[in-house]
Amino acid sequence: MVSRRGRFVGAAVAATALLAVAAVVVVRQLTGSGPGLPTIPDKYRSTVESAARTCPRLNVPLMAAQIHAESRWQPDADSGHAQGISQFSPVTWSEWGRDGDGDGQADVWEPKDAIPSQARYMCHLYKVVKDVPGDPTELALAAYNAGPGAVLKARGIPAIDETRGYVDRIVNDLLPKYEKSEAEHASSAPSPSGSSAR
């Protein structure tokens, strides 16, 4: 028979272990570290990397964070007014959509077309908002979401809840997580063949 003291000690040990696990979960959620980090799906990695290289203002974590916010990496995403992995409206796609995979068609539903088109359009938006006061990345993201005219008219991020939430989520939540995720990816990538780690 287990004494009361033995049961108490056992319960205290179990409670301490549970608190330790909970603390680790909270720290991971607050810092964005650990297995909960978002990652670029392997099938889109090379497309995102090459698209980000086409514009000096872009980088892989920013492109990834924006795609995550737009569609959660779903190439068949359809919000009713925007389509595909990069969520282009039909009007914007007709101007900025390009054939990125070389099959002769600019297809909003094809990530190899949509992701490079997203980079091209974002690069254009950086130029459009260059004279607007504020952070250029936040302004370009706001223009992607609300349209460049809305940003120019507001002389900043327009007072549209959806747009403000979109910019905030990308810049303050997703981008830091993708920066950490990409740093971890880079540190775990095998070294190029023929080189040795010293």
Where are these regions (language model features)?
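Cell-wall glycan
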Residues: 39-49, 86-91, 148, 161-198
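Extracellular cell-wall/glycan-interacting regions and their flexible linkers
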Residues: 7-32, 186, 190-198
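Residues at secondary-structure transition points
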Residues: 39, 80-83, 109-112, 135, ...
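Alpha-helical segment that forms one wall of the substrate-binding/catalytic cleft
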Residues: 43-50, 54, 90-153, 167, ...
